[in-house]
Amino acid sequence: REAFDAGASVMHVHFRMQDEGMGHFPSWDPDLCEEVVDAIRASCPGVIINQTTGVVGPDVSGPIAVIKRIRPEIAACNAGSLNYLKLKKDKSWAWPPMVFDNPVEKIQKMLDAMDETGAHPEFECFDVGIVRSVNMYIENGMAPAAHYNFVMGVASGMPVDAKLLELLLGYKREGAPWQTTLIGRQEIWPVHQRTAELGGMLRTGLEDTFYLPDGERAGGNGVLIEALAQCARNAGRDVASPADARAIMQLGEEQHGSDGVENTSAAR
């Protein structure tokens, strides 16, 4: 609710298992997910729900079942595969090297479920090639329109770099909405500011950073959204209400279906 009051018009939601000691694992229990989303919608009238869908492997039945139950306005669509890697300080692997696999067949299943329920796909782009792939998905007819999320800061993906951001805009479809997800510490904030200046939507949350622009640790999503809203104002833009954001993203009327939350503060 603090994030909503600070200007967040979109809530990106991850669902977690509720059993003791299992809270770091995702849950695709439709009953649980519906309960969470209903509580968010009740507390934050008009807010736009953006559902996570990421799974490793070919089985997408879990996220698809949740899409069909909660009917989010937006659903993430991981638009390409990535070697998901990170090193510790001693240069050993932070976790066993893995592939976040998103072949076209898997993407198509997700897009079909989104089309069936009226959810708008948000294409998660981890590198330049994935941005270009999204353009091909649209040209091929896999999805009607592109909404890009440039994910920067994954250790084996695109770095948080304002110059790279400017290049990416030359590869997306003209006129298509876009935003950045920036992962890191206080070094991400100048790129949030550049996103605002270049006309992108602004997004942050404890999923991506624990730090405010001055390096202080954030006590919650609310203060992060306050800082993000200031980036919009610094760029001469206003913070969009949920109704404004629906119009900007052409989402239509509010959806209703039947725990980490990341928040987007759209600006106009």
Model-derived segments and spans:
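Conserved, mostly hydrophobic/aromatic
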Residues: A3, H14, A75, V134, ...
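Active-site beta->alpha loop and helix N-cap motifs at the rims of alpha/beta catalytic domains
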Residues: P26-D101
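Short beta-strand segments at enzyme active-site cores
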Residues: A8-E20, I49-T53, F123-E124, A245
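Glycine-rich, proline-tolerant flexible connector loops at the mouths of alpha/beta enzymes
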Residues: S9-E34, M152, F210-D214
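Alpha-helix-loop-beta-strand connector modules within alpha/beta enzyme cores
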Residues: M22-Q51, I107-M114, L167-G175, G222-A232, ...
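Mid-to-C-terminal alpha-helical segments outside catalytic/metal-binding sites
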Residues: E226, Q230-T264
